[in-house]
């Protein structure tokens, strides 16, 4: 701005127009030391995946995104970091999975069910590759995956995404287990909406789903919620997955009165999951069909 000179008993009017400027601040993480730190100050090997990067991949669950990170593998649906063991019967996981700092591992078996992770409301994923048992217990021997859910901003925000996919042909014609007549029999355990309309003539299995989330501030309250619906016929016969998940949170921020502030809130989650799987196939030429002895 140019200097403004005002003489005695003189009134000067000056119009000032301001424009919006956006500046990306340093990323802040909490997993490395259980408190907020700048990513540049963290001394351990750490990757951060933002919600925009996840949305561009259109994954059906968060494990599809994690397997793209260097040093992270998903073996038998369980995470493994830098070649370490993932999950072992009777021992449990060696990579801790957290959602907002709370463990999501099954308390009995120590494994992760990716269907429980609210993909529709993820803000960022923090991945620490390396032992962190001192802070997070024995399950964090190989590393930590901390999934942070989104918090309401200054303006209400609604996100919606829909996706559909078709599995390719089997690598060998002998392995192909489905055709158009198979789906017309209408005897399969799950049936996507598009199977009965737009994709009724497709012989291969399909999957479809949508995510919806909304967040806003109402006075001193933060309100957020999300819904996910996913149907997958599976690339193997009877390897289907049908999922309905919804959840929400309500947080109250105590007004600032010159004292330390406390936040009060609660979360509600609901999951309905119908799925099928097998690990013994029928024959060497029918590897995508379950053995009759597994029923």
Question: What are the roles of these predicted feature ranges?
Answer:
Residues 210-216, 248-252:
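Residues on the lipid-exposed face of transmembrane beta-strands in outer-membrane beta-barrel proteins
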Residues 232-247, 251-295:
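Flexible loop and strand-edge segments within Gram-negative outer membrane beta-barrel domains
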Residues 160-166, 225-229, 266-272:
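Transmembrane beta-barrel strands of outer-membrane/channel proteins
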Residues 93-95, 154-160, 208-210, 219-223, ...:
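Outer-envelope beta-barrel architecture signal
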Residues 152-214, 234-236:
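Short strand-turn segments of transmembrane beta-barrel domains in outer membranes
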């Amino acid at each position: 701005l140019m200097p403004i000179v005002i003489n005695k008993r003189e009134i000067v009017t000056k119009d000032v127009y301001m424009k919006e400027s956006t500046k990306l601040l340093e990323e802040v993480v909490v997993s490395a030391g259980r408190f907020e730190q700048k990513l540049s100050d963290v001394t351990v090997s750490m990757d951060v995946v933002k919600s925009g990067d996840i949305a561009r991949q259109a994954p059906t669950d968060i494990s599809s995104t994690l397997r793209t990170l260097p040093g992270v593998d998903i073996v038998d649906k369980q995470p493994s970091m830098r070649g370490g063991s993932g999950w072992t019967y009777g021992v449990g996981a060696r990579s801790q999975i957290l959602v907002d700092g709370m463990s999501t591992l099954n308390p009995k078996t120590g494994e992760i069910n990716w269907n429980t992770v609210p993909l529709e409301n993820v803000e960022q994923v923090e991945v620490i590759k390396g032992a962190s048992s001192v802070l997070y217990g024995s399950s964090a021997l190989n590393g930590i995956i901390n999934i942070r859910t989104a918090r309401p901003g200054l303006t209400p925000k609604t996100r919606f995404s829909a996706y559909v996919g078709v599995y390719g042909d089997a690598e060998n014609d002998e392995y192909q287990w489905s055709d158009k007549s198979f789906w017309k029999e209408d005897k399969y355990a799950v049936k996507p909406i598009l199977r009965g309309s737009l994709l009724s003539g497709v012989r291969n299995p399909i999957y479809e789903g949508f995510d919806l989330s909304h967040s806003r501030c109402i006075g001193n309250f933060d309100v957020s919620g999300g819904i996910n619906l996913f149907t997958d016929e599976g690339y193997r016969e009877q390897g289907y997955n049908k999922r309905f998940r919804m959840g929400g949170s309500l947080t109250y921020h105590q007004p600032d009165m010159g004292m330390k502030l406390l936040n009060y809130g609660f979360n509600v989650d609901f999951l309905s999951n119908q799925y099928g799987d097998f690990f013994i196939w029928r024959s060497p030429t029918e590897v995508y069909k379950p053995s009759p002895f597994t029923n």
